[in-house]
From Swiss-Prot:
Identification of the protein by name: Kinesin-like protein KIF1B
Quaternary state and interactors: Monomer. Interacts with KIFBP; positively regulates KIF1B microtubule motor activity. Interacts (via C-terminus end of the kinesin-motor domain) with CHP1; the interaction occurs in a calcium-dependent manner.
SMART domains: FHA (SM00240), KISc (SM00129), PH (SM00233)
Kinesin motor domain span: 5-354
Keyword annotations of the record: Acetylation, ATP-binding, Coiled coil, Cytoplasm, Cytoplasmic vesicle, Cytoskeleton, Isomerase, Membrane, Microtubule, Mitochondrion, Motor protein, Nucleotide-binding, Phosphoprotein, Synapse
Comp. bias intervals (Low complexity): 1525-1553, 1620-1637
InterPro entries (UniProt xref): FHA_dom (IPR000253), Kinesin-like (IPR022164), Kinesin-like_KIF1-typ (IPR022140), Kinesin_assoc (IPR032405), Kinesin_motor_CS (IPR019821), Kinesin_motor_dom (IPR001752), Kinesin_motor_dom_sf (IPR036961), P-loop_NTPase (IPR027417)
Chain residue ranges for the region called Interaction with KIFBP: 270-350
FHA domain ranges (all copies): 556-612
Task of the protein: Has a plus-end-directed microtubule motor activity and functions as a motor for transport of vesicles and organelles along microtubules.
Organism: Mus musculus
Alphabetical GO biological process terms: anterograde synaptic vesicle transport; embryo development ending in birth or egg hatching; mitochondrion transport along microtubule; neuromuscular synaptic transmission; neuron-neuron synaptic transmission; vesicle transport along microtubule
GO terms for MF: ATP binding; microtubule binding; plus-end-directed microtubule motor activity
Pfam families per UniProt: DUF3694, FHA, KIF1B, Kinesin, Kinesin_assoc, PH
Amino acid sequence: MSGASVKVAVRVRPFNSRETSKESKCIIQMQGNSTSIINPKNPKEAPKSFSFDYSYWSHTSPEDPCFASQNRVYNDIGKEMLLHAFEGYNVCIFAYGQTGAGKSYTMMGKQEESQAGIIPQLCEELFEKINDNCNEEMSYSVEVSYMEIYCERVRDLLNPKNKGNLRVREHPLLGPYVEDLSKLAVTSYTDIADLMDAGNKARTVAATNMNETSSRSHAVFTIVFTQKKQDPETNLSTEKVSKISLVDLAGSERADSTGAKGTRLKEGANINKSLTTLGKVISALAEVDNCTSKSKKKKKTDFIPYRDSVLTWLLRENLGGNSRTAMVAALSPADINYDETLSTLRYADRAKQIKCNAVINEDPNAKLVRELKEEVTRLKDLLRAQGLGDIIDIDPLIDDYSGSGGKYLKDFQNNKHRYLLASENQRPGNFSTASMGSLTSSPSSCSLNSQVGLTSVTSIQERIMSTPGGEEAIERLKESEKIIAELNETWEEKLRKTEAIRMEREALLAEMGVAIREDGGTLGVFSPKKTPHLVNLNEDPLMSECLLYYIKDGITRVGQADAERRQDIVLSGAHIKEEHCLFRSERSNTGEVIVTLEPCERSETYVNGKRVAHPVQLRSGNRIIMGKNHVFRFNHPEQARAEREKTPSAETPSEPVDWTFAQRELLEKQGIDMKQEMEKRLQEMEILYKKEKEEADLLLEQQRLDYESKLQALQRQVETRSLAAETTEEEEEEEEVPWTQHEFELAQWAFRKWKSHQFTSLRDLLWGNAVYLKEANAISVELKKKVQFQFVLLTDTLYSPVPPELLPSEMEKTHEDRPFPRTVVAVEVQDLKNGATHYWSLDKLKQRLDLMREMYDRAGEVASSAQDDSETTMTGSDPFYDRFHWFKLVGSSPIFHGCVNERLADRTPSPTFSTADSDITELADEQQDAMEDFDDEAFVDDTGSDAGTEEGSELFSDGHDPFYDRSPWFILVGRAFVYLSNLLYPVPLIHRVAIVSEKGEVRGFLRVAVQAIAADEEAPDYGSGIRQSGTAKISFDNEYFNQSDFSSAAMTRSGLSLEELRIVEGQGQSSEVISPPEEVNRMNDLDLKSGTLLDGKMVMEGFSEEIGNHLKLGSAFTFRVTVLQASGILPEYADIFCQFNFLHRHDEAFSTEPLKNNGRGSPLGFYHVQNIAVEVTESFVDYIKTKPIVFEVFGHYQQHPLHLQGQDLNSPPQPSRRFFPPPMPLSKPVPATKLNTMNKTTLGQSMSKYDLLVWFEISELEPTGEYIPAVVDHTAGLPCQGTFLLHQGIQRRITVTIIHEKGSELHWKDVRELVVGRIRNKPEVDEAAVDAVLSLNIISAKSLKAAHSSSRTFYRFEAVWDSSLHNSLLLNRVTPYGEKIYMTLSAYLELDHCIQPAVITKDVCMVFYSRDAKISPPRSLRNLFGSGYSKSPDSNRVTGIYELSLCKMADTGSPGMQRRRRKVLDTSVAYVRGEENLAGWRPRGDSLILEHQWELEKLELLHEVEKTRHFLLLRERLGDSVPKSLSDSLSPSLSSGTLSTSTSISSQISTTTFESAITPSESSGYDSADVESLVDREKELATKCLQLLTHTFNREFSQVHGSISDCKLSDISPIGRDPSVSSFSSSTLTPSSTCPSLVDSRSSSMDQKTPEANSRASSPCQEFEQFQIVPTVETPYLARAGKNEFLNLVPDIEEVRAGSVVSKKGYLHFKEPLSSNWAKHFVVVRRPYVFIYNSDKDPVERGIINLSTAQVEYSEDQQAMVKTPNTFAVCTKHRGVLLQALNDKDMNDWLYAFNPLLAGTIRSKLSRRCPSQPKY
């Protein structure tokens, strides 16, 4: 035994054409036996070096001295291995490497002698040595086999009969071998070369990106070399058998490198599997050999995975076994193949560590035969032991073992199947005994022959099948005897077998029509010299004459492969018959071969362009066309040679006889002239074109005449009306209408109300001035001014006072007449240079814009020496800059509905006082002087000669740059307000008030103490701060006080008059809840009676008796205001100080000292004490009773966000989270493509409204052929939202289902169009982006059939959506992680009696995954451990809520009304010079108005919080001794403050009810039952509330037909597979606007059982429920209207976004229709909608109820009658629902969520009925 390592050599080839075209660089270096590789991605990295036995440099040309040729490689490796083979060792050489690296070249080489590879050189030298060493004592025999491993299957390359895949088996003695693999005996190198060439042509090759002829299989060429030596002395012969395995591996590759797809990719996967397994085997063998452990035990890790692939299984002996092995690793030098080359080097480095234990194979046949005979004997003994001895008793004297086992087992296999059938039928089959003849005739089966009469084959097989292990033993016996027969085969028999196989191969090839040389040499297609034949002609010249078909002697048939008789030439095609034609080849008397073409019946066969129906004799060169596509040329070599001899001067035809020639000949012979046909067709098209053009011109002329006549008629009509109008105006004089006082009040109320609406006027200002804003920004960018402009809305409130320069002059004149401040449009100027923000009026912007234009025009004249270093100096009056407030306002406190005095317009502190003896006055004066000095020094105006100015700024003679204004040092941080009502009693209070900025942001807190003191009381010593030694005197003059702006009635009015609310259009109360003028007048009268302010006058009746003695009119009163601490102010504001003043005396401010603010540690301690003395007047008492004092906090702003982040121009200010709009904004409808342009119709009166619940589904095509809804991600948790999870590149459909209550006015007629567009990756829609709109094909649109009594309508339509037509990358690719795709779809639906379609628009969110991805819906944390409802298929949809209004078309009105309705042009789209430099910036539009309204609402809520906090603090301090004056003075103020401009009346009532429910005895001062003590106004209010609470609804329908709820919340499926229409619908109680009483419901439907006993979960059903019909009592609009009015309805659909605030959620029981059962469903109240789900895990809304149009009823009498507790009803216009809660408390909670007013009424009744019980 000899142990040696595997010899490893590496060889690098030259660049191929692909690498040369890509200009690749060489990364391989070789020096001696060392090989290095350089990383092209990181050249600085040290090269990786490897050491091998041989390193061959074949990258250069042969002229290079270092070049390694084929001969050198063979001399180093091949000769050594051949020497080992002669010594008797097994030898293996295999090449490894990536595809195209040169493995096949190294192993096989090329045809040239100098290019031969290792295999041919080794074979050639093998026979040379045999010939040299052959003598009488030595004899040699060589056998070869050639197999291919393709896709893990083994194929024989030498035997054409072995077309199938061969089995790989393993024998205990032989090891792994290939069953039935041909082993052919050869006697010379020529035989091997022929076999090798034949096998190579049969190999599987294909082209990849890396190699044009890539080997797609592993080839193993095996040579069995036997040496026999006869010893003359002993007359004994010995044998040496060597097995030479030469392996050409397929290329290792990567799919992305080779570009493999389809079959190539599958092949590559199997190739990589084999090579990966080979690498694992190499690594495992290397680890085993390197193990130095002394332990001899086999470890678990020593397992070698030979069986993981066929390749390693067959090469097991060559890898680490009995073999001498050499490995050649082929390398690519190109840098583009770095990864593959490095992998090959690493494998080779591992392979050189493998140890092989090779032994000399001496006389293996004799040993093997002996062992096999022992194995046969053992198997026979085993069969005898099992009782089968009579089967295998064979006389050994008759013959040897050849064939007996095989014959018997063949019979056994043939009869096995019939035996099993016979066994199943329990009857023995009469098997044919013909096979027994073969058994008896077998030389080794005489014993079995003697028992034929006793035993049949059937009985033998039955015994074998019934014996355990018998079949396996027979199979192994067959295997062993086959090997014995093969080993005993003589050399002569092997040669005969080889010759037979060669003959069969040649016959098979000749049968296929492929010619072979007469000497039987190399295969190829040759032009025959004698035999007639056909060659193909193809349209592609490169494909012509590539096929050759022999015309054999006799008959050669042509037809299809599936013909009854075998066809010699097989063709395929549409016009090829099964038996198409035949060629008859016969020899004439003269010896000439004549070929005749005989077409079959109805076959299309053409010869030289003529169709033949009878036999035709063919001449050489004839063109034959079979069918339509198969073109051939007939060649007769002998006939052509004879013709050339007869006419040697025959000219060569000028045109080649090819496919084109044959086709043209066919057309000519058929009478078809292509040129004439084309001319004729062209003439026909010209005639058609002229005809259509004449028709179009005629139609256009007719249309022009029609338009002209219509224009003339309209002109005459306008002239006639204008003349009549002028005549009427001249003749008629307007008479004064005699109005009554009541009518005048109504008109005044309406005028003041509608004058308050500013939405349209603000929008017009924004649109009309947008062009100026854009131009200013463009000039700023051009001149490199660091200024940005944007629109902003300002409202004059206490928190955000508007400077007087921003108020228009006409507004100042009418300022006192308004009950509340107006909103103005201003320009926000962001000074990025100084970090300041200024506000300009529109007039100021236009003035500055003129200067900017002038500066821009003269900018080119500026000297080049002017430097832009104005950063070092402060700017002057640049039009782009305003003065910067270094002390910035942080915040302020409550807001009032009344106007704010103009004194708050001054933003800089001006501490002046009315008394001259105050020390603080002197200190304040000093501070003011210092500030003025600082201001003069720091903010010096820039002059025109200053070099530090911006470009062009020195052009103005006054030295003012129009881009800049002066900036102050201080910025207002915020404001806070403190009420003084505690001075009425008097009690000291310490307030902690919020410092609120102008944007409603809380910037900190301020602690202020207010108390009444004696005139000579000393202030406490706080240790720091300023303690005033004097007392400031403030006067409250009644006359001056009443004339002030701030004393508007809106500040103290406690009524519910809507005219006193600040209204920005669209934010006020809805039309359904607006109080009529009579109510308003009645409330105004109540205001007069209650003693509140009205038109600036105070009614003080009875007040003097309630105030204390310390506030007697005319007396002196002193109180103290102490500013204690400030906390929570950001550290960006330094040098914090505070000043405060009274509202009517803004010029008298009291200031503290500035304090350093570091933002950490203890609060800032001002401890500023100010004593204030006043003379008590009615104005003073009213002031401390209802009004606060204002505190303003200033600071030096150190950090400027504008410097740090350069805010985006188009980023709007973000409102608070509470009022922020929904995450996905509502989009405008996508324009229709098939419909005419829809004009925006002015809507008139709304005739009816419907709530639409719409389901959106996207279905994808499944492998089953069905469209299944795609998975929807509902993890966001918000209603009406979800993300579709789609697969890439799959056909889809969009399904839309509309659900609504039945109505006579609403009938869906058809779907006009469904369009999709606006593909984007963000929720916001870029209006400027141009996106292709795709109109989808509607495949179905129908109303889903429901029961005739159902109160809900289901309308569904479906469209085909091919997302590839958008040509959008977002839809075609897989969506990156974290990104979402948004798309807008709009459905245009036609309704009956409507003049234009209704439009439903929805923004859809999507995420695309790969085609094969397994998509499952994400599960929220709540459902992590439970079964999520989203697994249900009907959960894969997204819902939308819409409100449909059917309105009458508004009358156009008079010309004056039309002028007032004119639409202001949006100038934001107008082009200005330099606009392209703004990088997509756009002026703010309508959204700015909504955001500003949200800010005002937040400020108002902050105001209410501070006011309520003061009231509660004072009441807590007073305890139980709350005087009546407190409730009289503060309660109305608080109640008035609860009115909000955006809250509904229901929310107001609920707030009032809540406040009244909190200890009414403490808050009002009287007991709830003591009605006699109420004042007149409170009596009036109580009476009104009582009327509302006890209002009796329409009860004319005493009998309710049907139950309360007519639908289960189950899935209703009109389609068998998809329960898609799961809904919530209810039976119609009455269509009237009022809900009938539920007390008179049928007792049969109201079972006495509780819902808990009868409740059941909803389940999907296949049919709609049967509902009861209720007569309609209200005549619908269409029934009342005339026929002409039917066409005047205009549909208006608006999407409604549900609120994010959940009032209540939980389970409720719903009464089921026509039964006594109750269904349990999950309900979520998000006002104003109630969402109904199947369960708490159901993500899809199944039903909705609009609480704003519904009526909630609760009756104890009803519950007593039906004996069902805790029930209440919800009635809409068309239906009613009966609900039941779990218990009393749960029912009260639900009632409060549904209707707070009703819940408050119930609580009041319970509290009066059971006063001792706690209130709900």
